[in-house]
UniProtKB/Swiss-Prot annotation:
Belongs to the CobT family. Pfam families: DBI_PRT. This is Nicotinate-nucleotide--dimethylbenzimidazole phosphoribosyltransferase. Its EC number is 2.4.2.21. GO terms for molecular function: nicotinate-nucleotide-dimethylbenzimidazole phosphoribosyltransferase activity. Gene3D superfamilies: 1.10.1610.10, 3.40.50.10210. It catalyses: 5,6-dimethylbenzimidazole + nicotinate beta-D-ribonucleotide = alpha-ribazole 5'-phosphate + nicotinate + H(+). It comes from Nitratidesulfovibrio vulgaris (strain ATCC 29579 / DSM 644 / CCUG 34227 / NCIMB 8303 / VKM B-1760 / Hildenborough). Pathway: Nucleoside biosynthesis; alpha-ribazole biosynthesis; alpha-ribazole from 5,6-dimethylbenzimidazole: step 1/2.
Length: 357
């Protein structure tokens, strides 16, 4: 493993779960029946642990990174959209016209768009666009590794640097978002490799496939797993990410690792972002305590994924857009959880009698 990457991972402190009891005691002393705010209480308690017991809890400033990259596997016919849509959507993000732009504005969340691996040369200069291209797309995972180990490590380090910059700007929460035509295919392959799932069980329509086209996508993923089997079986999670992933997926995995390094809560978006989280978790298990799955993706295989991860997403809205949209919505819930912890009165403060034990 790259020395710089190893040094970041070695510097990550696991979340102190021993603080959970103190957090719950405080929540139980607020003017409400115990547990009556449900998962908001769980969120607040986890944020308290991430903060090391420091109060008040803070989620803001919050920032979503929508990271873009192209995929060689697009040539295998696994998406109904042409590959140039990746580049077109990056321009749409920069100009404020996409779903993630609207939801970040609604939620009061900062948005940064990142070209990590799009085909073509530089984009026109734009204040909303970070241009740090690691490479121009990947090779087809159905024919060999998506990228070299060196390229994958560069993408991971890019993601780590994005988290570092967010922390330097005072952010307390970051979110993952993606853009890359065909990226449900490498994401599915990563789930199969990391979690032992079967492509036939978790491959879905992505951006709109149906019937025979989905079955073809399953076969492409099977070929990818077979041609890269020697890499996967060697058990190195970074090498597996290089073989089966994408540049934006690796960058998002680095963002997760970097968030943990800087003690930031990290909100994970949908199907693709959860693949990036899974890679980060395999590379460094301690990142898990900092991460929150924002929503249950409508991709049919996502339930099997979260079951394998033993995780519980926050929202169930039938979303399957990506871009970070679910993360932006979940950040509002996290802000609400922090405010409850910080601002609700205790029974003693309010002069309210507690329930009998």
């Amino acid at each position: 493993m790259n020395h710089e990457l190893r040094s970041v991972i070695d510097a990550i402190n696991p979340v102190d779960q021993s603080l959970m009891a103190a957090a719950q005691a405080h929540l139980d002393n607020l003017t409400k029946p115990r547990g009556s705010l449900g998962r908001l209480e769980e969120l607040a308690a986890r944020l308290y642990c991430i903060a090391g017991g420091r109060r008040p809890l803070r989620v803001d400033p919050a920032r979503v990174f929508t990271v873009a990259g192209d995929h060689g596997v697009s040539a295998e016919g696994v998406s109904p959209f042409p590959q140039e849509v990746t580049r077109q959507m990056v321009l749409n993000f920069a100009n404020g016209g996409a779903g993630i732009n609207v939801l970040c504005r609604t939620a009061g969340v900062d948005l940064r768009v990142v070209d990590a691996g799009c085909l073509g040369g530089p984009f026109p200069e734009h204040p909303a666009l970070i241009q740090r291209k690691v490479a121009e797309g990947t090779a087809s995972i159905a024919r060999g590794p998506a990228m070299s180990l060196e390229t994958c490590e560069k993408a991971l380090l890019l993601g780590i640097s994005l988290a570092e910059e967010a922390a330097a700007d005072g952010c307390r929460c970051v979110g993952t978002g993606d853009m890359g035509i065909s990226n449900t295919t490498p994401s599915t392959a990563l789930y199969c490799a990391y979690l032992g799932l079967d492509p036939a069980d978790i491959t879905g329509p992505g951006a709109g496939l149906a019937g025979e086209a989905v079955r073809h996508k399953v076969e492409v993923i099977r070929r990818a797993l077979e041609v890269n089997r020697h890499i996967v079986e060697a058990g190195d999670p970074v090498a597996t990410l290089a073989a089966l992933g994408g540049i934006e997926i690796a960058t998002l995995a680095g963002l997760v690792i970097g968030a943990a390094r800087h003690g930031l809560a990290c909100v994970i978006d949908g199907f693709i972002s959860t693949a990036a989280f899974t890679a980060a978790w395999k590379i460094c298990p301690d990142v898990r305590g900092y991460c929150f799955l924002s929503h249950a993706s409508a991709e049919p295989g996502y339930r099997s994924v979260v079951d394998a991860l033993n995780a519980q997403p926050l929202l169930h809205l039938g979303l399957r857009l990506g871009e970070g949209t679910g993360g932006a919505l979940a950040m509002f819930l996290m802000r609400a959880a922090a405010d409850i912890f910080n601002d609700m009165a205790t029974f003693a403060d309010a002069g309210v009698s507690e329930a009998d034990d």
